[in-house]
Swiss-Prot record:
CDD domains: STKc_JNK. The gene is Mapk10. This is Mitogen-activated protein kinase 10. It comes from Rattus norvegicus. Serine/threonine-protein kinase involved in various processes such as neuronal proliferation, differentiation, migration and programmed cell death. Extracellular stimuli such as pro-inflammatory cytokines or physical stress stimulate the stress-activated protein kinase/c-Jun N-terminal kinase (SAP/JNK) signaling pathway. In this cascade, two dual specificity kinases MAP2K4/MKK4 and MAP2K7/MKK7 phosphorylate and activate MAPK10/JNK3. The modification Phosphotyrosine is found at Y223.
Length: 464
């Protein structure tokens, strides 16, 4: 698909009508849900009202009007809404059964704490947090109010992107990741449905339910990223560091070029086979880093020489070289070759990726070197609590946010004028928000990303 290139403040744009005409990868059928969309006549109190959204009930502050379902996943349901106080459109995520078990409760706490800490233009902003319940005993629902974007990256991947758009989107991903890494936060769940964009090519990273701080003394968990985007060190049950996210970015970039998933494994074993068939069997030096049982399995697999990157990503898959920014297929391919490296010790860092010729044409110190977020809960990932203890911690966070909120925006977050959706673009209360194509909170299924499944014996333990 060929799109005209437009310049908007020297940055690329995307044709939202063409790019985002499809629904996102895991969507709610709005037309069928809206038929059952009715306001409850019984108000919770004078601040809240209830709306039936499919099989769920949203009990929200009156300031949020015209709720329309736009997405659902294992961890929540998302509605677009109009915020009458801020005069802008927002996304409201209701966490699904946050206190169902310890894993759900810990994820909810982690997501809330990290979203309150981060403050970067390439990470989704938390605008408000609330619960309709008034006491800890009644507490059961958590609502997160965020910026509303136009679509997730799943739709963009299907477009024929020119080099400007591709490199600018990647630059923004890397800026957001660097901001997280600067505070020792590893996202761990980067995938196209967790990255959202607007038609002006603004990009933001979503979903911190699986993010964790680096350096935890606990065994890191393998079931953390949708299988297709998992780094080799995750597949093989090794410890991992920040550049586990860089592998995921490489997979996303490769998908932008090929328009299909790079390593579509059916399970861990098939995933590993898909990787080595294309990139080659790793060297003995890497094998020595594996647990004995895993190493024994890997060493007994067929050996693959792998393909060169010009064969994996030939020029025919890339757009024409850019005259404006001198961006070339050879540069993009070189970046891919540095990201898609099996041995994490040899994989490019986020800092070096931002300095790569394919990326640094957009380099802005204010974006790259933004002050790191301050994580106030230093034991965020070492914490182990009962469900009731997690519930109390989350309730305190919500109450604390409500006290600190002024004019509906959590202190420390960008003001409406700096958010992705300008107030001039907001729809009045009587308008429809059905033209907002998507904002995905698509969570992968528990079988793919259940962080409760610890790596005590390595993910390839089934091969023993």
């Amino acid at each position: 698909m060929s799109l005209h290139f437009l310049y908007y403040c020297s940055e690329p744009t995307l044709d939202v009508k063409i790019a985002f005409c499809q629904g996102f990868d895991k969507h709610v059928d709005v037309s069928s849900v809206v038929k059952h969309y009715n306001m409850s006549k019984s108000k919770v109190d004078n601040q809240f009202y209830s709306v039936e959204v499919g099989d769920s009930t949203f009990t929200v502050l009156k300031r949020y009007q015209n709720l329309k379902p736009i997405g659902s996943g294992a961890q929540g349901i998302v509605c677009a809404a109009y915020d009458a106080v801020l005069d802008r459109n927002v996304a409201i995520k209701k966490l699904s059964r946050p206190f169902q078990n310890q894993t759900h409760a810990k994820r909810a706490y982690r997501e809330l704490v990290l979203m309150k800490c981060v403050n970067h233009k390439n990470i989704i902003s938390l605008l408000n947090v609330f619960t309709p319940q008034k006491t800890l005993e009644e507490f059961q629902d958590v609502y997160l109010v965020m910026e509303l974007m136009d679509a997730n990256l799943c739709q963009v991947i299907q477009m024929e992107l020119d080099h400007e758009r591709m490199s600018y989107l990647l630059y923004q991903m890397l800026c957001g990741i660097k901001h997280l890494h600067s505070a020792g936060i590893i996202h761990r769940d980067l995938k196209p449905s967790n990255i959202v964009v607007k038609s002006d090519c603004t990009l933001k990273i979503l979903d911190f339910g699986l993010a964790r701080t680096a350096g935890t003394s606990f065994m890191m968990t393998p079931y953390v990223v949708t299988r297709y985007y998992r780094a080799p060190e995750v597949i093989l049950g090794m410890g991992y560091k920040e550049n586990v996210d860089i592998w995921s970015v490489g997979c996303i970039m490769g998908e932008m070029v090929r328009h299909k998933i790079l390593f579509p494994g059916r399970d861990y074993i098939d995933q590993w086979n898909k990787v080595i068939e294309q990139l080659g069997t790793p060297c003995p030096e890497f094998m020595k880093k594996l647990q004995p049982t895993v190493r024994n399995y890997v060493e007994n697999r067929p050996k693959y020489a792998g393909l060169t990157f010009p064969k994996l990503f030939p020029d025919s898959l890339f757009p024409a070289d850019s005259e404006h920014n001198k961006l070339k297929a050879s540069q993009a391919r070189d970046l891919l070759s540095k990201m898609l490296v099996i041995d994490p010790a040899k994989r490019i860092s986020v800092d070096d990726a931002l300095q790569h010729p394919y990326i640094n044409v957009w380099y802005d110190p204010a974006e790259v070197e933004a002050p790191p977020p301050q994580i106030y809960d230093k034991q965020l990932d070492e914490r182990e609590h009962t469900i009731e203890e997690w519930k109390e911690l989350i309730y305190k966070e919500v109450m604390n946010s409500e006290e600190k909120t002024k004019n509906g925006v959590v202190k420390g977050q960008p003001s409406p004028s700096g958010a992705a959706v300008n107030s001039s673009e907001s729809l009045p209360p009587s308008s429809s928000v059905n033209d907002i194509s998507s904002m995905s909170t698509d969570q992968t299924l528990a079988s793919d990303t259940d962080s409760s499944l610890e790596a005590s014996a390595g993910p390839l333990g089934c091969c023993r």
